[in-house]
């Protein structure tokens, strides 16, 4: 429950299209990492802080060929998921700090994808 990801709508189709266009999928993984790295500081800033600040300290960026990922929590911070997404049975309201951070930085990380798409399209013969 501690590792959560926010996926962009249409990301799967985007990856399929880029693969068909001959895009370097390792390069797409790097673009995904840069996008996650852009949103990470905002997620850290928005994370609720208690006495220790362990939740904010557990936030990290990652990437696959399919998505950039911001993870919060680990074994020593198992409450990250309930704090971000809520837990109705325990009367914990969602804080959505990771989701809000990704949404608020969209204009910045979207430029990374735009640059990647333009570069890939320029490499396609006849485009």
Predicted regions and their residues:
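Short, Lys/Arg-rich flexible segments
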Residues: 1-77, 81-127
């Amino acid at each position: 429950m501690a590792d959560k990801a926010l996926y962009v709508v249409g990301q799967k189709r985007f990856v399929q299209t880029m693969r068909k266009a001959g895009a370097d999928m390792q390069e797409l993984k790097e673009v995904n990492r840069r996008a996650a790295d852009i949103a990470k500081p905002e997620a850290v800033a928005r994370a609720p802080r208690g006495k220790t600040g362990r939740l904010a300290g557990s936030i990290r960026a990652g990437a696959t060929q399919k998505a950039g990922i911001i993870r919060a929590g680990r074994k020593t911070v198992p409450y990250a998921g309930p704090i971000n997404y809520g837990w109705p049975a325990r009367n914990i309201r969602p804080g959505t700090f990771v989701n809000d951070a990704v949404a608020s930085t969209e204009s910045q990380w979207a430029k990374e994808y735009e640059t990647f798409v333009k570069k890939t399209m320029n490499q396609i013969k006849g485009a």
